[in-house]
UniProtKB/Swiss-Prot annotation:
Residue segments, region DNA-binding domain: 357-441
GO MF annotations in UniProt: DNA binding; DNA-binding transcription factor activity; nucleotide binding
An annotated GO BP: DNA replication
This protein's name: Regulatory protein E2
UniProt organism field: Human papillomavirus 38
Length: 441
């Protein structure tokens, strides 16, 4: 063990010489990491043989020395590959080749020229975060070639280019969800505001160069869900929008309705002329419905001139009766305005379902747990829900302190879709859920 202690002392002296010399070349940095690897090997050997102290230095555990030895080996391999590049003759310091610097974002890259920037969340100067960005970044390509590029900052985060690919190594959106409420932030460089929110929406997560300007643009739909979402435009009498097929049928019926109205006007004029001639003692009805020529009986309806305008659904039924030349059966009443499938039950059930508010599920749990669950079920239940929110929290009326656990909402097109989702969902441990409805989304 005396020989082991002597070798350990020699290693310590060589490391001190490197630290005191301050040489800033790549060969010195490679030598530094090789000495650190040998130091951990001695620690590991001593621990295996029951030695707990080498001189005044305590011997770490086997797992610790093994992990640090592997880190030293990986650093030696990286530095030796960098030595073969055209950047080997540049100035390299101990800080630039440290394990912490290499593993900091962007990971497995060498960085130079650190700069501090500040991001203010929700426009509150007290709610800010400080980030370290880099002026120059050295990354290894797929062909094992080192490239040197400049680092950049925009509203979305800090990034650099790998060829034509824009790679973000910092995204402010993640911390905006954690520390903010509105999801907005400002980027300050050298105490100057260089990027401010342009819209009230959260910036996208994409890697395009115009990601900040695309925040206000709607994303086009690329897939058809099992149940089509209702139209967002306002409808008369609070009626919900129908499917596209129903809308096209209504357009065709509108044309027939115009023809039916002209026929009713001609029929009323012929009835008045007949009564004036004395050929018919019975007064002709001038009500909103027409007389069926085949059955000779009158449809019940109100006088449109005395009772006001006929509602849209009623005028549609009248126009259908006039254009067809007869009445319709009771089970066909209202079929043109149904927006729920025929398999949904009776007429009352369909009307209640048609007037129902959008159903939702509220999840409560840890923020990271909810985010991981959202990532999984968006792949597993694709098309099985309408919307899913980001994680959010309640705050009090007197402070911005968060109350309780994080929340997340799932919205659905119908009750049946929500029930189907509940039957197949598997929530993580510690996540609770409850049902609810909104007037609109």
């Amino acid at each position: 063990m005396e020989t082991l202690s002597a070798r350990f002392t020699v290693l310590q002296e060589k490391l001190m010489d490197i630290y005191e010399s301050g040489v800033e070349d790549l060969d010195t940095q490679i030598q530094h990491w090789q000495l650190l690897r040998q130091e951990q090997i001695i620690y590991h050997y001593a621990r295996r043989h029951g030695v707990t102290r080498l001189g005044y230095q305590p011997v770490p555990s086997l797992a610790s020395s093994e992990a640090k030895a592997k880190d030293a080996i990986s650093m030696v391999l990286l530095l030796e590959s960098l030595k073969k590049s055209k950047y080997a003759d540049e100035q390299w310091t101990l800080a630039q080749t440290s394990l912490e610097a290499v593993r900091s974002p962007p990971a497995d890259c060498f960085k130079k020229g650190p700069k501090n920037i500040e991001v203010v969340f929700d426009g509150d100067p007290e709610n800010l975060m400080s980030y370290t960005v880099w002026t120059y970044i050295y990354y290894l390509t797929d062909e094992d070639i080192w490239e040197k590029v400049e680092g950049h900052v925009d509203y979305t985060g800090a990034y650099y280019y790998e060829g034509k690919l824009k790679v973000y190594y910092l995204k402010f959106e993640n911390d905006a969800k954690r520390y903010g409420v509105t999801g907005l932030w400002e980027v300050h460089v050298n105490k100057d505001t260089v990027f401010t929110p342009v819209t009230s929406s959260t910036p996208p997560v994409g890697d395009s160069t115009d990601s900040a300007s695309r925040a206000a643009l709607p994303e086009p739909s690329t897939s058809v869900s099992p149940e089509r979402p209702p139209s967002q435009t306002a409808r008369r009498y609070g009626r919900k929008a129908s499917s596209p097929s129903t809308t096209s049928r209504r357009q065709r019926k509108g044309q027939r309705e115009t023809t039916g109205t002209q026929r009713r006007r001609k029929s009323r004029s012929r009835s008045r002329s007949t009564n004036r001639g004395g050929r018919d003692t019975r007064r002709s009805s001038s009500r909103g419905s027409s007389v069926s020529p085949t059955r000779g009986r009158r449809r019940g309806g109100g006088d449109s001139r005395r009772r006001g305008p006929v509602t849209r659904s009623r005028s549609r039924s009248l126009s259908r009766a006039s254009s067809a030349g007869g009445g319709i059966s009771p089970d066909k009443v209202g079929t043109a305005v149904r927006s729920v499938g025929r398999q949904s039950g009776g007429r009352l059930t369909r009307l209640l379902a048609d007037a129902a508010d959008p159903p939702v599920i509220l999840l409560r749990g840890d923020a990271n747990t909810l985010k991981c669950y959202r990532y999984r079920f968006r792949k597993k239940h694709a098309g099985g829900f309408r919307f899913v929110s980001t994680t959010w929290s309640w705050i009090g009326d007197a402070s911005n302190d968060r109350i309780g656990r994080s929340r997340m909402l799932l919205a659905f097109y119908s009750e049946s879709q929500r029930e189907k989702f509940i039957q197949t969902m598997k929530l993580p441990t510690g996540v609770e859920w409850s049902l609810g409805q909104f007037d609109d989304l």
